[in-house]
């Protein structure tokens, strides 16, 4: 190579590090103001703090050699360099620290991209999932939002794809439920594939179909899409998905909730049976388990232990309430128990300015899309409380969200709200207000709360007790994280008491009533022992709030309802929604219902809660009991002066009445005393046993580690087991015939996916409770017959799976687009044409005419001569002897028309005299 020549390949390789750094930094600045539903976990927060410091990247030519080369240029890099660049470090993985990204055997370029992102240690879901995906296993991962599950499936997919395939066809598909989540996942894919020639695109609804046609013609390797638009493009473009190697269902529970089940089943049929399927979800509803059984091959269920356990730093309190006093209990808990401060005028003004500013930004975006957004305050980091009193309130339906939010705002609190069908922009705005401490309370439903994750919370309040113990764990698990303390308060009425007893069995923590604790203190005092302390971590302490305070809170609620008509209307709607919610809620166990009746019969279940100390109401009741035990019991009818004779008819009537009911009262008193003796006998036995036991053994025996090892197999050991080396070719090897009994035994094994999924399955009720009557028929005058009221006149076509899909999916727009651009149809599996790069310059245009009065006349003349040599005609420029003498019929016709026009215009009589 001469001195004047320039090596483009080496220059690009040297500059790759600096370019990628600038891209990362610019992308980071754009996202800082964006508040998204998915919030990183504690480990990711620590690593993200180091993102501000740019990592030092060596300028060795290890970047992908042909990253910026056009299709016509040759890749001069040696094959050994490329092999070394993409080599997975299996030898180094054995030397790497266990549990690190390097221990997974990832390639060098992927480890560099991970380091650029600032990630140092994998999260628990990544540590358990990535090795299984690398072993080509189908995985069902249960992980809440913010646990790092996006990287858990993106990293192994990128590692296994490595580089762009010259064959036409998509190799990896990632399906997301919403546009925002798809864009967020696509951003992660772009960052992790930086430095490779892997092509990735995103397909979401609302974007131009023509642009998406162009994107699909670039032969992408990774496709991130929403199911509706992807199915639309598949049908419209008649895509063949036989080249798909990996399919990922992200937030799969939300995919089914949002009505994508038909699209997913249609896509599942089109996929090849040899693909690897990955399914990630925060919960496992039954429909999702059925889908996993049908669409996945021998899947592995990955669950984190934290998903089914309550933090040992969590303290719980359960408050009993009457049917009409739930709102009063909520206000009392917020004001007196949590000590929630009321909003000041400055805080209200600041919140209004924020909301008005967001509305102004929306209007400005419609008028001037290029206008820079307003700078927002940065929310609290993931390991810090948004505010000292940050509280999340769970309600059953979206109607309750509107009602409770309005009630608390009228009471003077700063409140944000989120429910399932809330607009995405409003959802982000409400979440930002809570995380940036503009508000202290967030009112949500179970469906909406599963899509967000607030890393650190001070308190959780259950407006109603959920119908499932697993949903309760999912709720209260949002506080007391990362070693922080937290409180969970639940409001329970008599209908929800059986669910509390189910929760008692599920958690292994006994219910503690006020009367039980007082008897325990009395027994300890008689035996000379110190009074036991109330443990809100190990017991489910049940009781009511002080009666006087509840009455004052109820009076406040009545005043708010009396003075606010809209609040009364919303309350009525919420009450109707609550009726539907109770109707569709799964019932409690029969045994818990029986025990709940026994507890309510004792009358001790709604005594004042131990959290509030001595009960003043009880002293008043004791005084009234003394009056009831007085010897002379006279009614107002029997009151008379001394010496007066009993001649009054009313006095005689009361004496007769007393004689009649005396035996009934005596039997009732004896039965009550007998029940009290039986209860006390069992209670005394339980209390003495608990005193002799340790604090952590509340009525239950603990197994030691040896017993557990004999019964269960350790999941980490199963993961670390190495497969025996075999020389079988899986493509041709046929195993022995297994009889039906062997197959049945294998399906009935305790370690099967069905049993594990059944243990983790629970359904969340929809927060928008509307009664649907699908079989109501109505008379159609035009058709002259009864038709289903829910039916529509939409036209459908039959898809590959036999299901009906909208006929608008096949509108012919792709064929029109392809013909207008003279593009060849996609042939899946064929070699791609090298000249089909999207940004390659392919247009051949004639140069401009050279102008003698310009300085570049000679340069332009050379361009024209070169174009003429290439056969491109330049308008107005002809070489000597180049002008065509023979004319076409069209030229002759036009010439005749011009001649006739000139003749008609100029053929005037001559002025000369003849």
UniProtKB/Swiss-Prot annotation:
EC number, as in UniProt: 3.6.4.13
Q: Which reaction does it catalyse?
A: ATP + H2O = ADP + phosphate + H(+)
Q: Where does ATP bind?
A: 143-150
Where does it live in the cell? Nucleus, Nucleolus
What residue intervals hold the motif Q motif? 99-127
Extract the Pfam families matched here.
Answer: DBP10CT, DEAD, Helicase_C
State the residue spans of region: Disordered. Answer: 1-81, 353-389, 840-914
Write the record's keywords in alphabetical order, separated by commas.
Answer: ATP-binding, Helicase, Hydrolase, Nucleotide-binding, Nucleus, Ribosome biogenesis, RNA-binding, rRNA processing
A biological-process GO annotation: assembly of large subunit precursor of preribosome
Q: Give the protein family.
A: Belongs to the DEAD box helicase family. DDX54/DBP10 subfamily.
The Helicase ATP-binding domain, residue ranges: 130-302
Question: Which residues lie in Basic residues bias regions?
Answer: 901-914
Any GO molecular function: RNA helicase activity
Gene Ontology CC annotation, any one = cytosol
Extent of Basic and acidic residues compositional bias: 849-858, 887-900
InterPro entries given in the database record: DBP10_C (IPR012541), DDX54/DBP10_DEAD-box_helicase (IPR033517), DEAD/DEAH_box_helicase_dom (IPR011545), DEAD_box_RNA_helicase (IPR050079), Helicase_ATP-bd (IPR014001), Helicase_C-like (IPR001650), P-loop_NTPase (IPR027417), RNA-helicase_DEAD-box_CS (IPR000629)
Write down what this protein is called.
Answer: ATP-dependent RNA helicase DBP10
The segment(s) forming the Helicase C-terminal domain are 368-522
Which Gene3D superfamilies does the UniProt entry name for this protein? P-loop containing nucleotide triphosphate hydrolases
Please report the organism this UniProt entry assigns to the protein: Meyerozyma guilliermondii (strain ATCC 6260 / CBS 566 / DSM 6381 / JCM 1539 / NBRC 10279 / NRRL Y-324)
Annotated motif DEAD box, positions? 250-253
């Amino acid at each position: 190579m001469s001195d004047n020549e320039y090596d483009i390949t080496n220059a690009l390789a040297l500059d790759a590090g600096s370019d990628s750094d600038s891209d990362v930094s610019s992308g980071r600045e754009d996202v800082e103001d964006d508040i998204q539903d998915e919030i990183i976990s504690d480990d990711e927060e620590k690593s993200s703090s180091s993102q501000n410091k740019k990592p030092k990247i060596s300028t060795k030519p290890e970047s992908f050699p042909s990253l910026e080369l056009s299709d016509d240029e040759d890749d001069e890099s040696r094959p050994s360099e490329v092999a070394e660049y993409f080599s997975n470090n299996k030898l180094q993985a054995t030397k790497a620290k266990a549990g690190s990204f390097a221990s997974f055997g990832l390639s060098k370029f992927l480890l560099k991209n991970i380091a650029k992102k600032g990630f140092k240690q994998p999260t628990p879901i990544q540590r358990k999932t990535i090795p299984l995906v690398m072993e080509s296993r189908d995985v069902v991962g249960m992980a809440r939002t913010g646990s790092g599950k996006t990287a858990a499936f993106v990293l192994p997919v990128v590692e296994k794809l490595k580089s762009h395939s010259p064959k036409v066809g998509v190799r990896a598909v990632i399906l997301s439920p919403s546009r925002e989540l798809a864009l967020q996942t696509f951003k992660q894919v772009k960052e992790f594939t930086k430095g490779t020639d892997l092509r990735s695109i995103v397909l979401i609804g609302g974007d131009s179909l023509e642009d998406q046609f162009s994107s699909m013609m670039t032969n992408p390797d990774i496709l991130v899409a929403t199911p509706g638009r992807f199915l639309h493009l598949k049908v419209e473009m008649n895509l063949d998905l036989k080249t798909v190697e990996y399919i990922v269902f992200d937030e799969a529970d939300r995919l089914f909730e949002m009505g994508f089940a038909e699209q997913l089943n249609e896509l599942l049929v089109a996929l090849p049976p040899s693909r690897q399927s990955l399914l990630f979800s925060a919960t496992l509803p039954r429909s999702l388990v059925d889908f996993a059984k049908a669409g996945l091959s021998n899947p592995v269920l990955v669950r984190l232990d934290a998903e089914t356990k309550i933090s040992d730093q969590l303290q719980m309190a359960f408050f009993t309430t009457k049917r009409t006093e739930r709102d009063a209990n909520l206000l009392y808990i917020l004001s007196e128990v949590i000590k929630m401060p009321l909003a000041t005028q400055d805080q209200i003004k600041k919140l209004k300015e924020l909301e008005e500013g967001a509305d102004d930004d929306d209007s400005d975006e419609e008028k001037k899309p290029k206008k820079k957004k307003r700078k927002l305050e940065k929310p609290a980091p993931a390991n810090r409380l948004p505010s000292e009193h940050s509280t999340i309130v769970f309600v059953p339906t979206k109607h309750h969200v509107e009602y409770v939010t309005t009630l608390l705002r009228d009471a003077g609190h700063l409140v944000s709200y989120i429910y399932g069908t809330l607009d995405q922009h409003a959802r982000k705005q409400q979440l930002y207000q809570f995380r940036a401490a503009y508000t202290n309370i967030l009112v949500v439903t179970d469906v909406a709360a599963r899509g967000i994750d607030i890393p650190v919370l001070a308190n959780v309040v259950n407006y109603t007790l959920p119908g499932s113990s697993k949903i309760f764990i999912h709720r209260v698990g949002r506080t007391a994280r990362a070693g922080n303390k937290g409180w969970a308060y639940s409001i329970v009425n008599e209908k929800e008491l059986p669910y509390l007893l189910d929760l008692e069995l599920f958690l292994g923590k006994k219910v503690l009533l006020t009367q039980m604790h007082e008897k325990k203190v009395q027994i300890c005092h008689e035996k000379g022992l110190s009074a036991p302390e109330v443990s809100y971590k190990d017991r489910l302490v049940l009781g009511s709030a002080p009666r006087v305070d509840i009455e004052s809170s109820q009076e406040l609620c009545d005043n708010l309802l009396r003075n606010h008509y809209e609040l009364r209307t919303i309350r009525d709607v919420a009450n109707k929604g609550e009726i539907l919610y109770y109707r569709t809620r799964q019932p409690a166990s029969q045994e818990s219902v029986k025990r709940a009746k026994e507890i309510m019969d004792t009358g001790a279940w709604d005594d004042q809660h131990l959290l509030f100390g001595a009960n003043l109401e009880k002293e008043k009741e004791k005084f009234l009991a003394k009056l009831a035990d007085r010897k002379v019991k006279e009614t107002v009818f029997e009151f008379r002066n001394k010496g007066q004779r009993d001649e009054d008819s009313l006095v005689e009537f009361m004496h007769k009445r007393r004689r009649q009911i005396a035996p009934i009262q005596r039997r009732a008193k004896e039965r009550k005393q007998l029940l009290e003796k039986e209860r006390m006998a069992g209670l005394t036995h339980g209390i003495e046993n608990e005193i002799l036991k340790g604090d952590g053994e509340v009525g239950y025996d603990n197994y030691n580690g040896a017993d557990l090892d004999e019964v269960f197999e350790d999941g980490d050991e199963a993961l670390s087991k190495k497969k025996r080396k075999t020389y079988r070719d899986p493509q041709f090897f046929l195993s022995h015939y297994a009889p039906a009994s062997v197959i049945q035994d294998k399906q009935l094994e305790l370690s099967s996916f069905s049993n594990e999924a059944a243990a983790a399955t629970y359904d969340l009720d929809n927060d928008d409770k509307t009664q649907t009557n699908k079989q109501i028929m109505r008379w159609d005058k035009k058709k002259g017959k009864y038709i289903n009221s829910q039916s529509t006149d939409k036209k459908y076509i039959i898809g590959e799976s036999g299901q009906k899909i909208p006929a608008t999916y096949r509108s012919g727009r792709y064929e029109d687009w392809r013909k207008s651009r003279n593009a060849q149809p996609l042939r899946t599996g064929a070699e791609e044409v090298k000249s089909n790069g999207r940004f390659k310059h392919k247009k051949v245009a004639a140069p401009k005419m050279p102008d003698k009065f310009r300085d570049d006349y000679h340069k332009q003349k050379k361009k024209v001569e070169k174009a003429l040599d290439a056969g491109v005609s330049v308008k107005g420029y002809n070489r000597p002897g180049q002008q065509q003498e023979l004319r076409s019929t069209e030229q002759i016709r036009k010439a005749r028309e011009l001649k006739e026009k000139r003749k008609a215009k100029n053929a005037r009589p001559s002025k000369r005299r003849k």
